[in-house]
Amino acid sequence: MNDHGQHNREGLERLRRLTSLSDAELAKDTGDGWTVATVLGHMAFFDRLLLLRWDTYEKDGVFAELTPNHFDLINYAGAGDWSALPPRAAVARCIEAAERAVARINALPEKVVAVVLETPRVALLERMLHWSPHLVQIERAIGREI
């Protein structure tokens, strides 16, 4: 298994353990007005966005480009909706979106993987690049490892 595949598998194992969080832990503040559940909604959104980016690549042969400014705008616009999710739904959506993203990545032809590895888009393959900082953020908020 390639490194990104192994890292994604390990990340999914950690994400699945989020089901053990209590309601109080899901409501913990993570900073900037976000709760643990908000972070999970954010993670689910970006894994679903990843699927659309792969759809675009498959259809058009090019990646849908996003600048750092786009991410800031998306986060600002999405935070209210992510915060409104019932906490248990945020957990379920996060895990489901991550599983779908990893399944899509695992199904990519090796030639596509090779193309991505030559670009600054490695996060399209290795989801832990996005998940890991958020998992650390969650662990800090709840005061324990997941």
Question: What residues fall within each predicted segment?
Answer:
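Alpha-helical bundle segments that constitute or directly flank the non-heme di-iron/ferroxidase center
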Residues: 1-23, 48-55, 129
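Acidic/histidine-rich alpha-helical segments that form the ligand environment
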Residues: 8-11, 17-20, 73-112
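Short, contiguous alpha-helical
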Residues: 26-73, 110-146
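Generic detector of short, locally flexible boundary/turn motifs and exposed helical patches
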Residues: 2-6, 56-58, 65-68, 99-101
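Residue-level recognition of alpha-helical structural elements
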Residues: 4, 32, 83, 87-90, ...
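Hydrophobic packing residues in well-ordered alpha-helices of helical domains and bundles
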Residues: 4-12, 36, 87-94, 124-127, ...
